[in-house]
Design a protein with these regions (language model features):
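Bacterial Sec-dependent N-terminal signal peptides
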Residues: 1-23
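Structural preference for beta-rich elements and adjacent junctions enriched in aromatics
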Residues: 20-212
């Protein structure tokens, strides 16, 4: 089956600022993962598709390499052409989970997706013509070239992520779904499993009644 290698920028803590190209597994429509937090649907994905903490980079220059005694991660990504969705399995061990505060200062898994590799800025303040009306830049520009998901690990109450941009429906069904598995409490060590899918914004243009 043909393999897809779109550009996905994974910013777990801080991945290298330089773009990296990762393998994405091709799921047939009848084999897409059930979003239930169970990892068995991912057993078919080859080991060399897995992204680990070895790909992480601490960007403040305090550590030469990740400390696996404090954080270990494993990420697998899949794509289904029929559903036009990206599927993620994120597994992480942390020696201290922080998630009770409703802010981005808690543990998150951050994903930025540029579905057609069009490139260019996607944040309102970097609008190429710098419109005087900041709200026009927000609604008409922010999140167009790429979509930025700040995914809480685990969820903040009923909210599983902060989608940075006005297209908030992209984090809701049928465009996204998620499931967690964990047993730790705030401040404890433990393993978290996060399974979710998201829909590339560009593939929603012909399928959505929302204004994009």
């Amino acid at each position: 089956m043909k393999r897809l290698y779109p550009y996905l920028f994974f910013l777990f803590l801080c991945l290298s600022a330089q773009a990296q190209e990762f393998k994405v597994y091709q799921f047939p429509a009848d084999k897409v993962p059930a979003i239930d937090g169970n990892t068995h649907d991912w057993d078919c994905v080859p080991a060399d598709y897995k992204i680990t903490e070895a790909a992480l980079k601490e960007d403040e220059g305090k550590h030469a390499q990740p400390d696996t005694t404090t954080l270990k991660v494993s990420v697998k990504v899949g794509w289904c052409a029929e559903t036009q969705k990206l599927y993620f399995l994120y597994e992480a061990y942390d020696n201290y989970w922080r998630f009770s505060e409703n802010s981005l200062n808690t543990d998150i898994f951050e994903v930025v997706v540029d579905g057609d590799c069009s490139g260019g800025p996607f944040i309102d303040r970097f609008h190429p013509t710098a419109p005087k009306d900041v709200w026009q830049a927000w609604f008409k520009f922010h999140g167009c070239h790429a979509q930025n998901y700040h995914i809480f690990t685990p969820a903040h109450g009923n909210d599983w992520c902060m989608l940075w941009g006005p297209q908030v429906w992209l984090k809701q069904k049928p465009y996204a779904d998620y499931a967690y598995q964990y047993s730790f409490k705030e401040g404890e060590a433990g393993k978290l499993v996060l399974e979710f899918y998201i829909t590339d914004r560009k593939s929603t243009r012909l399928n959505s009644s929302h204004s994009v």
